[in-house]
């Protein structure tokens, strides 16, 4: 694949009209605490197998993108990556306790779907700009189709984020049977 010129990269990144909030994004302490026991818990009641883990960068900003079958998927992706991932998540996950506490205190990004998720995309910018990992489900919701095509149409957020950060690797993750 040919590389884009610097002028082309500059045009691409400016044309998506995506900027951050300017606020520092940190991985909260609760996320770090959960990293200590969630992998053991997940392995105790699931039969998870991973392939291709050698393709996951261990340093720098990364966009993790993939299908979404169940509420376990973010945990599975974090377990596979062995890195903190900050996911774009629908506002419904932030409305009631204890979910709200967990989502806020593990660094997940609240996405208001009806407004197009502009605030969430700005926070996604902040995550990547600071060299952290972003998780996104391009369909914007869980896949519930039982026959081909299994996936729903994707949203534009992943394309806009990837265009704004063309040097950040996008790691596709496929989950079966969650």
What residue ranges belong to the model's regions?
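A transmembrane-helix-recognition feature enriched in membrane-embedded lipid enzymes
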Residues: 2-51, 76, 97-106
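Soluble catalytic domains of membrane acyltransferases
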Residues: 27, 44-178
């Amino acid at each position: 694949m040919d590389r884009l010129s610097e002028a082309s990269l500059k045009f691409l990144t400016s044309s998506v009209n995506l900027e951050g909030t300017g606020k520092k994004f940190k991985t909260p302490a609760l996320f770090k605490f959960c990293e200590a026991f969630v992998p053991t818990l997940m392995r105790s009641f699931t039969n998870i197998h991973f392939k291709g883990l050698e393709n996951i960068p261990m340093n720098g900003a990364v966009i993790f993108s993939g299908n979404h079958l169940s509420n376990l998927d973010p945990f599975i992706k974090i377990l596979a990556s062995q890195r903190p991932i900050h996911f774009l998540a629908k506002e419904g996950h932030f409305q009631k306790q204890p979910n709200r506490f967990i989502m806020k205190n593990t660094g997940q990004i609240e996405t208001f779907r009806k407004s197009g998720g502009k605030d969430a995309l700005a926070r996604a910018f902040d995550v990547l700009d600071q060299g952290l990992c972003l998780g996104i489900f391009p369909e914007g919701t869980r896949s519930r189709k039982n026959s081909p095509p299994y996936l729903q149409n994707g949203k534009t957020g992943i394309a806009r984020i990837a265009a704004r950060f063309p040097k950040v690797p996008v790691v596709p993750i496929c989950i079966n049977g969650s």
